Design a protein with these regions (language model features):
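Macrodomain-like recognition of ADP-ribose-binding/processing modules
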Residues: 1-244
Length: 244
């Protein structure tokens, strides 16, 4: 078991748990939180419901079990408008350290929490995370520095479609309008877009189109890996306080 810092894409990790960083007002509009929103839309919908009910508070961890991953939402902001606070990050790290063994977590992938949109200097984040995570035993810990063109299974799925004999046959199923779909395919084939973050920045393509693309690619990836499951009823589910 080990602690390691890597450069890559957190969503390519094989860890059983992935860490997302969230505010407590129901917005996932930037950075890694936006990626989690697009890749795990059911989790996002439940997160919004719980925020509306004022369930989330800063400095706590809220877990959500997706089809094949445990997602840990670290509440390191109160409102998205304001910076993260190092005391909230450390409070979450202490909770994780106190409860990960009881929860049976033997591998986890973190981003550098609060360093991108949280407004906290990276060196402060690194010192705090190393202090709390390096001593932990019986667990594989990966901390990711994001590389926008590193391997990403979702982008790989898009590449397979773009370079297939007839990529247009997927257009209707994708839910993406034809002109935007063609732009996306051309960007992948021409290598002007080398990752999902670059796809998101293609001129003229809006957030709703990108959301449709993520849903489609996620479904394609699940089907290709035999991970398709019936949609679960989340009407009676809320994010679970990690320490419970």
């Amino acid at each position: 078991m080990a602690y390691k810092e890597v450069t890559g894409n957190l969503f390519a990790s094989n860890a059983m748990a992935l860490v997302n960083t969230v505010n407590c007002v129901g917005a996932m509009g930037k950075g890694i939180a936006l990626e989690f929103r697009r890749r795990f839309p059911e989790m996002f919908r439940q997160y919004q419901i719980d925020c509306d009910k004022k369930i989330l508070v800063p400095g706590r961890i809220y877990s959500y079990m997706s089809k094949d991953r445990l997602i840990l939402n670290f509440a390191i902001k109160d409102n998205w408008k304001y910076p993260s606070k190092i005391q909230w990050i450390e409070a979450c790290l202490k909770q994780f350290a106190a409860h990960y063994q009881k929860k049976g977590i033997d591998s986890i992938a973190f981003p550098w929490m609060g360093a991108e949109n949280g407004g906290i200097p990276l060196e402060i984040i690194q010192a705090a995370m190393r202090k709390h995570l390096q001593p932990l035993e019986g667990i594989e810990i990966e901390v990711y520095t994001f590389d926008p063109i590193a391997y990403d299974p979702l982008f790989e799925q898009l590449q397979k479609i773009a370079f297939s004999e007839d990529p247009d046959k997927y257009q209707t199923e994708s839910g993406v309008q034809r002109k935007y779909y063609s732009q996306i395919i051309e960007a992948v084939r021409g290598k002007t877009a080398r990752g999902m973050s670059e796809i998101s920045r293609i001129k003229g393509i809006g957030k709703t189109t990108i959301d449709h693309l993520y849903v489609f690619l996620t479904q394609q990836l699940e089907d290709s890996e035999g991970r398709h499951q019936e949609k679960k009823d989340t009407s009676e589910i809320q994010l679970t306080l990690f320490e419970q």
